[in-house]
């Protein structure tokens, strides 16, 4: 590996890994569950890099040995041929390992391990847009099942003809944000609605927002900025005074963000859920502002996370999904069943390629 800066990074990672391993055996740490979990998680995040680096080091030693055998076997054509073959195989293996290590050393998004709130809003297209929003709720719920993630419906506004005007899902599990962060944007569908008698293709949209979950330490909300009213779970209004008002309608006055939460059984639980959603929305706004502030710096071609960015078109007639950031098509029927892993991995790969190109450019100018 010619790049000395990569070797320096790998040696630093290996040293950190060994130090974490040592600390995990410390009685003061083993007796502190919180600290033990934090250190174990940090160590686990470095394990793949360290293991790959060890394989690379061993392969380098093997390559030196194979080259030495090749050099000394001039009088033994058969042995020389075997040594030449081993040299070629090891050089190919080392090149692959170096590609893997370069990717493993890329800066990690600190949000990647977060759980998320996934908000889907019907866009243009009337009733069909709401039905499409409902289809996307099912798509992401099915995908979450394949990942062994836990999905909860936090808030919903159902449409008269089916689907949702708006729905917010909470998705919990391993590396949820890292996989779903590229889903943010406008999802356009082209299909013949069930209600369309003439068979004309309609175009509708739904907007997806991916909001990492945050706690009250990360986002401070002044209680004076909150306007909160309660209603029965069926919605505001009505005359049934005997039914407990469990629904919560919350407005954040500085931003105008409104959250209506009805899914929990008690008013207290709905209030906590509404505040949880509000924190995520405010944090998402902060992230969007930061992205705008660094517009002169790198912006991923895979997507800025902007809600106004059209990222995909789902064409039912041609059984085709087009991801406009990738300029790539996928089979639609699998996608609708929640099989979006190939699309997600393609987005991750493109993002990695961009980061690698940026890293190489930075080294050239250093």
Swiss-Prot record:
Record SMART domains: PCRF
GO MF, any single term: translation release factor activity, codon specific
Tagged with keyword Cytoplasm: yes
Principal location listed in the UniProt entry: cytoplasm
Disulfide bonds: none
A GO-annotated cellular component: cytoplasm
Superkingdom, taxonomy of origin: Bacteria
Modified residues (N5-methylglutamine): 239
Post-translational modification: Methylated by PrmC. Methylation increases the termination efficiency of RF1.
SUPFAM superfamilies, sorted: Release factor
Main function: Peptide chain release factor 1 directs the termination of translation in response to the peptide chain termination codons UAG and UAA.
The name this protein goes by in its record: Peptide chain release factor 1
